[in-house]
Amino acid sequence: MLRAVLQANKNGVPLHKLQAEYKSVTGEPIPFKDMGFPALDAYLKSIPSVVRIEVSRVGEVTCYAVACKETARIAELVAHQRSSKKKGGHQVNCQMRLKSTAPVSHFGKPKITLRQPGFTPPQEMMIRKPVPTPPWGKGNYFGPRTFEYSPQPIPQLFGVAPMQRHLPNMNRPERKVTLPPRFQREVKSPLLPTPITDSNANHTQSYKRVVIGSGQSDLPVIQNNLKELLNKHSNGLWLSKLPQLYKETYKQDLGGEVLKQVPSWTHICTVQKLVSSGHTEIVIYATTRKQQPSTKNIQNRSNDQAKPNVPVVLSTPSSPPPLQISGSIPKDELKEKISTILTKYSNGLWYHALPKVFEDMFKQKLPIEAFNLDSLTDICTVDLISEEPFKAILYGKSAERAVQNSNPSVNNNIPQKLHDREPPLCSEEPDMTMAPPPLVIPSEASPSVLVVELNSTNDVVIRYIGRDYSAAQERMEDELKDFCSKSSTAQVRPLRVGQLVAAKAEEDAWLRAQISAIEDKKIKVCYVDYGFSETVDITKVCKLGKPFYTLPFQATKCRLAGLEAFCDDSVIIKALEAKACGKILAVEILHKSEKPLVVLYDTSGDDDININAACLKELYDRSLSLQLKANLSFSNVTVTNVCSDGTLFCQVPSKGLAKLYETLQKVDGEFQFQQVTSHLYVSLPFCGKICLYHYKGKWARVEITNVHSSRALDVHFLDSGTIASVKVSELKEIPPPLLRDLISIPPQALKCCLADLPLNIGMWTPDAVLWLRNTVLNCPECSIKVVKIDEAMNMVHIYLFTSNNFPDLERSINRRITNEELLKQKQKDVFLNMSVSSLEKGRGGGGAPASQLFPSGPCISPTSVAKKPDMQQSSPVPSFNMPPALPLPRPGEHMDVFVSVACHPGHFVCQPWQELHKLELVMDEMRLHYSTTEEKPIALEKNKLYAAKIENNWYRVLVKGILTNGLVSVYELDHGRHELVSCRKVQPLIEKFMHLPFQAITSQLAGINCEQWSEETSIVFRNHVEKKPLVALVQTIHESTHPWERRVVAYIVDTTLPDTDIWIHELMTEYLAQFSKPE
C-alpha cells in the first residue's frame, strides 16, 4: 500500500508529509514502531525495493516509489482518491544560484580593526581579544595566507546561486593548505539575535523573548495553529518552509513580522540553528518533543559541503546533564570507560556531551572530578577550537590520525612510529564498526582528478589529485608495504565479506581493499582507493592495522552534468572512455554532494576542452550533416550573421535544416500546451549546456559559453552563429521527449569567408561591415559557390551572390566589396591593422590586386597616434550630467577597500569594498544592454566618456587617445586600469549607467617617501596589496575638477591575521632599509 501511495505522487512525497498522505488514504499512519524501527526514515531505508529516498539541494528529503506492476491498479485508485483533495495553485521555482561576476577577483573580507598604537579604538584599549575569522576566510598558520571571497548580499530579486566557473589552466590557483571549519573561529551575524555557534556544532538553542506588537489581535489563533503544525510534524519544520505550509493548511498568510517572532515563542517551540558552509538555517520543534533529531539527519541537511563528520550529541540547555557521583569508580576503570567511548566516536566527541554519553553507555553518572580537561589529557587529545572550553573536541589516541586527514593543514603522513610498534599491536583486528572518515571534496575552485573507470555517466569513478589526496595515499601505501612485509601475523582469519584488508597487487604493492566475495582459496576484492575489483589468492591478504583506517577511501564517484539523459548510451560511454579514462583532468564542481555533479575539462592543450560537451557532440546524426565539395553551388541560402572580421554564417537548405525546423515546431507546441513549471527553466547553468531561447518569435538552440552572474550569461546560437548575452531567466530546458532529436541535429550555421579577399587580417572598417550586413542580411534569397574547404580552420571559402546576380562572378559580393566606387572616401581604411605588403601576400587565385583596396603611398605605422579623430560618422556623443562624486572619509578616518591595481607605493587604485556589489549589478545591466543593442559607429573624441567591451565585460571608460590602427586607449573609471581596445568595441555610455559614482580611487601610500621606485620594490608592494581586501586610513585628500583625477594619500593596513595588523608602509620601510644596506 505504501508503494501505491508513492506511485500516485509522480514528483515524490516529502518525508515530513508521508505520514499524512498515507493516513489520508488508508485511515491510519505507518506503524513503523510496531515493526521495531525508532524512526520513519529508518524503516523506509530498510525497504529499498519499495521506497527510493533522495535529498534535494536544499536538504529536503523526498520519497519516491520503486516501480511494481502489481500495484499499478492500486496507484490509479489512490490518485483518483487524492485528486479531490489537491489544493489549487502552482508555484514556479525560478531561484538561481548566486554567482559573482568576473570583473574582479575578491578574496576574503576586510575588517576595520586597527591595533596599531595611536589608532587603537577605545573599546580595544580596555581588553584585546582575537578577532574572529569569518567562516569563509580561511587562513594558514604554516604558510602563505590565502583569501576567499564571500559575495556581498544580493537583493532577493536576483535569486541565490553560488558562483561556478571553470578556471583556465594558467589562471588556476595554486593548491594551498587551508584550515578546516573546526579550526575557524565563530563570527556573530548582525542579522540573527542568537549566541555564537560553532560551524561544526548543531546545537538546540532557545531564543530570547521578543516583545510582540500590539496590532496582532489574532496572535493566540496563530500560536494555536503553530502548535498543531509542530505536533503534526514531530521531526521539526524548516523555518523558511513555515509560511508556505501554514498557508496550505489554514488558508491564511503568515506575516513576515510574525515569522520573525516565531523563534522567540519558547512556550510553543524549541529552536535549533544549523550552521554549514557559513550559512545558517533554523529548524523549529514542538516543545514537547521527546528526542532530538539524529546526527545523521542533521548531516544530511548540510547539502552542499561534505565535511568531516564530528558526532554531535544534542541536549537542551535548560536541562544540563547531571554530574553527581552515584558511586565510587576506580580511576583506571574510569579512564578505560572514557577510552571506550572515544574509540566508538572515532571522529571526535564534543566535551560538553561526555557526561550524557557516559551515563547512556554505562548507566552511571560521570564523577565531577573526571569532567576536567586536565584530567583527560593522558587518555585523549583535546582540541580547543575557541576560547569557550565547552567547545573542545575530544579524540581518542587512535583517532588522532583521522583528525589529521580531515584537516588539510595538519601533516597527514602515516606516522613514522608505525615501524617501531610491536607487530601484534598493529595487527590487532580492528573493530568491524570502524570505518575511515568520509572523503572531503577539495575546496579549490578547479581541482584536478584522475578518471579511473566508468560504466555510466552517473557513476564515473575518479580520484582527486593533490597533497592531501593522491600524495597522502602514496605515503600511506609505502607505510602499508613496509608493515605488511614485516608483519609476522599477516594472514587474516577468519575472512568475512565486507571486511577491510590489505591485498598484494602487482609490483609488490600492498593496497587497501574490501572483500566482496569468497570462493575457496580465492577472494574477490575491491581496491577502495582505485575503484576497481580483482580476484586474488587468499595468501596475498594481510590484516589492515588501525593506523591505515585514518585516510578516507580515495576512489569516489561523480555525475557528469548535461549527460544525465544519456547516462547509459553506448556512444557516449565509448567517447568518454576515449577522452577521459586514465587522464588527469580539471573538474568544475557544480553541486557538492555524496556524488557531486561536475564538468570535466582537458587542459593539456592550448585550449581547454569541455569533455561533457565533446561527448554530447558524438550523438550527432551524420546523415543530417551538410555534404560540401568544391565547385558546388547552393541557392536559397540565408546569411544569418556577419562578424566584424568579414566572417559570415549561412544556413544552407539541407535535410538537417528541415529536421531542425520540424523539431522546433514540436517544441513550440510542447510549450504552448504544457503548464509552466519550475523544471522548464534552467536552474543550473554551466558552460557547454544546450538549452532553448525564444528569439524573434521562434525557439532557437543555444549553448552556454560563459556564466557571468546570477542574471546574465553568454550563449552561442548553434544554428545562426550569433554570440549574445542573455538573461538566465529567458532560457528554457529542452522538453525530455524532444531532447535526443534536438541534440542529434548538427549545428546548421555554416562558417564562411569571401574567397579572394585577405583572411586573418583583423577587423574590417565599420563602413565595410555595415555595407556587407545591409546587403546580405536583408536579402531574402542568396546563393553561394563553394571554392575551397579549409577543414583545419573549419571554414568554407565561397563566392556570395544576391538573388539576381548568380552566377556572374563579376557581380558577386566578393567583387563588389572591392570596387573602387564602393568606399570612395575611405578606400585606405577598408581593412584595419593591415599593410599593403601583407595584402599582396594574401590568398592567391585571381583575387583583386591590392591597388584596388588601397591607393599607393607609404604604410602608416600601427602605433602612430592621430592628432584628430579619423572618423566622420554622424552619431554624436550624448550629453548628460556626470555621476555624483564618490564620498570619501575625512582625514583620520578609515574605510574598507579592495586594491584593484598596484603599480608601486606612489600609485595604486582602490575601490570601496561596501560598494562593489553595486558595481557588479551595473556591469550586469551594461552587459545585457549592449549585447542586445546593434553596434553603431560613433565619432570618438578624446577625454570623453564611453562604454567599452574588454574581455567579454562592459566597462565605463574615459578615452585617453585614438590610434590610427583602429585601437583606442581607454581608462577604466571603476577599476583604474589602462587598456587598448578596438574602436568597434566602444559604444556611447547612456545615462542609465551614470547614477553610480566612479569607483576607482587613485591613491598613494602614506608614511613613506621615495622619488623613484625600483622594479623590485614595486613587485614587493604589489604582492602585498594587489587584489586584496584591506583597510585604508586616510591622511590627505587632493580634490580635483574631475572625479578620476582626485588623489588620496592613505595608510594601508592588512587586518586578515587574527591578532596582528600589518601596516604596509612599515613593511616597505623595512624592505627599503634592508635593500639599501651594503653587502
Swiss-Prot record:
InterPro entries: LOTUS-like, OST-HTH/LOTUS_dom, SNase_OB-fold_sf, TDRD7_LOTUS_3, Tudor, Tudor_domain_containing, Tudor_TDRD7_rpt2, Tudor_TDRD7_rpt3
GO cellular component: P granule; ribonucleoprotein granule
Keyword annotations: Cytoplasm, Differentiation, Repeat, RNA-binding, Spermatogenesis
Region of interest: Disordered: 109-132
SUPFAM superfamilies listed in its UniProt record: Tudor/PWWP/MBT (SSF63748)
Function, as annotated: Component of specific cytoplasmic RNA granules involved in post-transcriptional regulation of specific genes: probably acts by binding to specific mRNAs and regulating their translation. Probably required during spermatogenesis.
Name of the protein described by the UniProt record: Tudor domain-containing protein 7
